[in-house]
Amino acid sequence: MRNIPFFAPCHHIADGCFDVSTSASKSPFRLAVLISGGGTTLRNLIEKISAGLLDAEIALVVSSSSTARGLQHAENARIPAVVVDRKEFLSQDDFSQAIFEHCRRAGVDLVVMGGFLKRVTIPADFANRVVNIHPALIPSFCGDGYYGHRVHEAVLDYGVKITGCTVHFADNQYDHGPVILQRAVPVLDDDTPETLAARVFQAECEAYPEALRLIIAGRVVFQDRRVRIAPA
């Protein structure tokens, strides 16, 4: 496993954070993608990698359901996939340990949640190595129960004029970890949950690969709970 700059806390001087290093390894950055359903995020990442727009390889797909349609995307791309069903485990910790043991065996550098609907406990060796995308601007419309169309329904019910998506590091609370980047999407007067979801997903398709590119390039640096993007 390579040393990746964003894993370790940054050093501090009086006026903030400095010392951004870069990874010396030139081997492809290895991702595990966690899915629960249709795998639209997985498909987007496969397409970006195939087009040369993301310098990474998907080493493993982990699905929480044997019937997840996203498993077909993994099969089509000849990506190893495994099903880890929550019902087969007595506790969340046991379920989580099984997922991350598969990730260890696959030698992944980063775990990417792509519509993964099961809560996991992130082990110490994967702290700041799990990322998630949420279809709203955290800290709004997020947390337990806010997923899928429920998010967009809440946005419309509240009457906000701007929504969007947030890529963040995952921790052991829902939609809580440090924010890497966000993209804004205007809410239109005639929007429905379906039309709004479609536009937010288009923003997600650009934001997630961009966040991964920043991580892979070693440009993501922590300053307390804030994420700073170092110059290229």
Q: Predicted regions span which residues?
A:
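One-carbon transfer enzymes
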Residues: 2-232
